[in-house]
Structure formats: C-alpha cells, structure tokens
Amino acid sequence: MEVTFLSASGYTDPSKNNGDCILVDNGSELVIYDCGCEEHARRVVEYMDEHAYSKAKLVLSHNDADHFDGIPYLIDQGVLSEVYTLLLLKYKDELLDRVNDKRRTRDSIARRIAEIYDNIYSLSEQVILKDIFTDTLVADEITIPGPDKEY
C-alpha cells in the first residue's frame, strides 16, 4: 500500500489554496481522496500513466472547491470509474422527517440540497456516484470509516 500526498510545490501559484489530493495505491487499484485543483488532477493523470492505471476511484469528502475543483479535469480525461461521496438527495425524506417544521417540503429540501451541494450535484450525469454511507469498501483494503449516516 502506497499513500502519496500531493503538494502545491512547483505549481503555477503555490500560495493559492490548491486544496487536498491524496493518492492511495493498493498495487492493483488507485483511489484518489479529493482533488482540489486542476494541477493536482494533471499530476494524478501522470501518476496513472506511470503506474499503468486506466481508471481510478475517487472519494470526495465534501463539496468545497478546495476538495472538488480538479474533478472536472479527471472526468474530461475519462479516468474516473466511480466517485464516492455524500448523496444527500437520496435521503431527502429522512432529512424532512428530522427537520420537519411544517414550512419545508420534500421539493424544497431537494432544491436546497442541490443548491448547497452544487458541485456534487453537477457530477450526477457525468460519472457513477456511490453513497459514502453505504458503499464504504472502495477497493481491496481501502475502506471509508466515516462519516456514518447519523453524522
């Protein structure tokens, strides 16, 4: 198992928040944890070429740009097989039950989730999305320990 943390050293603007990107290579599959900028994404593709990976899985911890902004490049390059992330739209009925103040509806909850989680929502027609709550085994020996659904 090899874990590589990408840094902004040598990037066009290393002072900018280039975000996170961690590569987890178990020897037969590559898992990318977040991809905060396009320069990270370019390095991911280089790594994949050097290690003969045509596809990788990606775990997106959350919606923020510094974790997301390199993902469109990876999709454009066709290198992602699946993205594991929070699929809150799937749980809109449960969320409504928890926050039901008689002012919200299922539709308003769905619209609000789509607004707040716009980056994740934008992926829904471009790549296979997996639920981080239920699909926790990403690859051999690579598991998502949390968050759990109660979080």
Q: Model-found features: residue ranges?
A:
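Active-site metal-binding motif and surrounding structural segment of the metallo-beta-lactamase
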Residues: 29, 38-90
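Generic serine detector
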Residues: 7-9, 15, 28, 54, ...
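Flexible, acidic/histidine-containing loops and adjacent segments that form or flank the divalent-metal
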Residues: 1-6, 68, 73-151
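Detector for Asparagine
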Residues: 17-18, 26, 63, 100, ...
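Conserved beta-strand hairpin/beta-sheet module of binuclear metal-dependent hydrolase folds
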Residues: 1-51
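Conserved residues at beta->alpha junctions
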Residues: 35, 62, 146
